[in-house]
């Protein structure tokens, strides 16, 4: 039968909505831009229902909660769950990236923040899940949570007052390979070590940076914490991009290396450090 749908635009409302009409119409206009990426109008209608119900849901933000909010609690959910297996994720994020670029000044660099996080889960059969260090745990005690490791990129949309809000423009799951048993053979252990290297969060970030680099010809300024301010990522930044990252205050900063004929390059790495970030911060002459 036809998919369960919430009313489009301002249809079938019970009372005055004041500014809600324009808000819902604007949101519907944004959703309509995602329609070409779906295989059929029915799939788009089901996805639209879940998105709108997710905004109205006052309970847990799950598929069950969204469908219950949409009034489909006692109906067959098979089509709704099968939809999640064929969502056009790449085309959806491409549309969001275009909208985020259009909302910023085309003459200025595109500012994109990146960070890794843990999405907590409860099911033990969800792919990519494992025990991870709790980023919100106290510093004096190591806590573990069950969830997925993900990498998210958010574009900064400036406001009139000088502040900015972040809009997600890319999302990538970054699972770690399962560690083999103690009795595994050497070939299995070697394969695990190689898979662990490929699953490094910095390598995943480099791949997604290269993907976002194709979204625009404008310069891109990446903003990150200290996790991504390292040699692995800095040496493989995409063309016409800049990374603004956090570092420790006692980090040793060196002058750029200058090649000299007849000199061995690694000897120049022994030059003394110029200063540290803390010294630069407290130096009034800088």
Across the structure, where does each feature detected by a protein language model lie?
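Electropositive, glycine- and tryptophan-enriched low-complexity nucleic-acid-binding patches
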Residues: 73-82, 136-219
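An internal, acidic/charged active-site-proximal segment
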Residues: 186-286
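Gly/Ser/Thr-rich loops at beta-strand to alpha-helix junctions
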Residues: 57, 118-120, 226-230
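Short, conserved acidic/polar surface loops in the N-terminal third of protein domains
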Residues: 121-127, 163-168, 180-184, 234-235, ...
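Intrinsically disordered, low-complexity and often Lys/Arg-enriched segments
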Residues: 1-25, 29
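Active-site-proximal, Lys/Arg-enriched surface segment
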Residues: 86-175, 284
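Gly/serine-rich nucleotide phosphate-binding loop at the start of the catalytic core
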Residues: 19-82
């Amino acid at each position: 039968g036809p998919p369960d749908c919430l009313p489009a635009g301002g249809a079938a409302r019970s009372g005055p909505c004041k500014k809600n009409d324009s808000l819902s119409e604007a949101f519907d206009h944004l959703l309509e831009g995602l329609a070409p990426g779906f295989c059929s109008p029915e799939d788009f209608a089901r996805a639209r229902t879940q998105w709108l119900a997710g905004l109205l849901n006052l309970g847990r933000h799950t598929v069950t909660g969204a469908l219950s909010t949409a009034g489909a609690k006692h109906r067959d959910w098979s089509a709704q769950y099968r939809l999640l297996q064929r969502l056009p994720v790449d085309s959806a994020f491409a549309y969001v990236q275009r909208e985020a670029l259009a909302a910023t000044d085309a003459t200025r660099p595109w500012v994109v923040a990146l960070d890794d996080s843990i999405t907590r889960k409860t099911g033990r059969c969800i792919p990519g899940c494992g025990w991870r260090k709790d980023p919100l745990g106290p510093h004096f005690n190591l806590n573990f949570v069950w969830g997925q490791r993900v990498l998210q990129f958010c574009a900064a949309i400036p406001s009139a007052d000088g502040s900015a809000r972040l809009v997600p423009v890319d999302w990538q799951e970054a699972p770690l390979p399962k560690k083999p048993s103690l009795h595994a053979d050497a070939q299995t252990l070697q394969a695990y070590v190689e898979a662990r290297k490929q699953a490094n969060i910095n390598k995943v970030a480099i791949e997604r940076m290269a993907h976002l680099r194709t979204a625009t010809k404008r310069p891109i300024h990446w903003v990150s914490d200290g996790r991504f301010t390292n040699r692995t990522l800095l040496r493989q930044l995409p063309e016409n991009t800049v990374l603004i990252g956090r570092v420790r205050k006692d980090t040793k900063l060196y002058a750029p290396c200058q090649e000299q004929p007849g000199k061995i390059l690694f000897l120049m790495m022994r030059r003394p450090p110029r200063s540290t970030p803390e010294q630069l911060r407290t130096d009034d002459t800088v």
